[in-house]
């Protein structure tokens, strides 16, 4: 795997994690 592919996968996981985190915070409020 190239560095670009690894970077892209990491960015996707970061975005998904951020969305889930935002949804949980919205539910808390």
From Swiss-Prot:
What membrane topology does this protein have? Single-pass membrane protein
* Induction pattern: Transcriptionally regulated by the KdpD/KdpE two-component regulatory system.
Enumerate the Pfam families for this protein. Potass_KdpF (PF09604)
Cytoplasmic topological domain ranges are 25-29
**Got a GO cellular component term for this one?**
potassium ion-transporting ATPase complex
Provide the protein's localization.
Cell inner membrane
Q: What happens when the gene is disrupted?
A: Inactivation of kdpF still leads to a functional KdpABC complex in vivo. Deletion impairs ATPase activity of the complex in vitro.
Q: Where are the transmembrane segments?
A: 3-24
This molecule's function is given as: Part of the high-affinity ATP-driven potassium transport (or Kdp) system, which catalyzes the hydrolysis of ATP coupled with the electrogenic transport of potassium into the cytoplasm. This subunit may be involved in stabilization of the complex.
Quaternary arrangement and interactors, per the entry?
The system is composed of three essential subunits: KdpA, KdpB and KdpC. The complex also contains KdpF, a small non-essential subunit. The KdpFABC complex exists as a dimer above concentrations of 30-50 nM, whereas the complex exists as a functional monomer at lower concentrations.
Under which name does UniProt file this protein? Potassium-transporting ATPase KdpF subunit
Q: Which organism is it from?
A: Escherichia coli (strain K12)
């Amino acid at each position: 795997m190239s560095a670009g592919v690894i970077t892209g996968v990491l960015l996707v996981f970061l975005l998904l994690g951020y969305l889930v985190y935002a949804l949980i915070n919205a539910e808390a409020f």
